[in-house]
Amino acid sequence: MTIASSNGSNRAQSPLITDLAEAINTRPDRNTHNGREPELHQPSEEDMESMMGAVRSILVGVGEDPEREGLLKTPKRVAEAMRFLTSGYNQSLEELLNGAVFDEGHNEMVLVRDINFFSLCEHHMLPFMGRAHVAYIPNQKVVGLSKLARIVEMYSRRLQVQERLTRQIAEAVQTILEPQGVAVVMEASHMCMVMRGVQKPGSWTVTSAMLGVFQEEQKTREEFFNLIRHQPAFF
């Protein structure tokens, strides 16, 4: 069994999946068309100008003056922030992994817990943020520990709903490693529930995705849940 934080691994590279590019581009989830990731373009300067214009319109719409001193640079700042917060659209698993898949012969649970993340709700474009716990039971192959955190980050930096985000992370790990099973739990606070709507600060949403042995075997699920509840003594 391996338990880690979101720190990286220094193993020597030994890529195993030769057709990874094809494998990771074909996953059935709600962001795909016919099982394939949609074609997305890199944001251009024209796109930036369009976003800046949209922000100016919003400022006018709420009764503000976009020409006053404090707001002069706001459209550009918001556009740059949105580009960063949605940068996961312009990343791929193939580039993210960079060959960091290794044949270790390990067959006990690997868990990286307490991965901090932030994302944007696709309904209101307000933030939600929290912690992710990602585990898998290898079938010979393992991945650099930091890559699990980067997978969480890549899918989080898109317009999301927490349920889909949880499932996408689990399916990504399943695709790249073909392990015996994958488990993902995400705990998050949603600003669309805190700042508007029901206005309930302190509420948390918990979602899970279980694949393979984590779905099929209660004992394996219980081990995972016990590990993510346990507080490490050395912190």
Curated annotation (Swiss-Prot):
Enzyme kind, highest EC tier: hydrolase
Catalytic activity line of the entry: GTP + H2O = 7,8-dihydroneopterin 3'-triphosphate + formate + H(+)
UniProt biased composition (Basic and acidic residues): 27-44
Keyword list, A-Z: GTP-binding, Hydrolase, Nucleotide-binding, One-carbon metabolism
GO MF terms, alphabetically ordered: GTP binding; GTP cyclohydrolase I activity; zinc ion binding
Pathway annotation from the record: Cofactor biosynthesis; 7,8-dihydroneopterin triphosphate biosynthesis; 7,8-dihydroneopterin triphosphate from GTP: step 1/1
Stretch forming the signal peptide: none
Record region (Disordered): 26-47
GO BP of this protein: one-carbon metabolic process; tetrahydrobiopterin biosynthetic process; tetrahydrofolate biosynthetic process
Superkingdom, taxonomy of origin: Bacteria
One Gene Ontology term, aspect cellular component: cytoplasm
E.C. no: 3.5.4.16
Coiled-coil stretches noted in the UniProt entry, renumbered to this chain: none
Family per record: Belongs to the GTP cyclohydrolase I family.
NCBIfam families: folE, PRK09347.1-2, PRK09347.1-3
HAMAP family: FolE
Subunit structure: Homomer.
Protein name, per record: GTP cyclohydrolase 1 1
Source organism per UniProt: Nostoc sp. (strain PCC 7120 / SAG 25.82 / UTEX 2576)
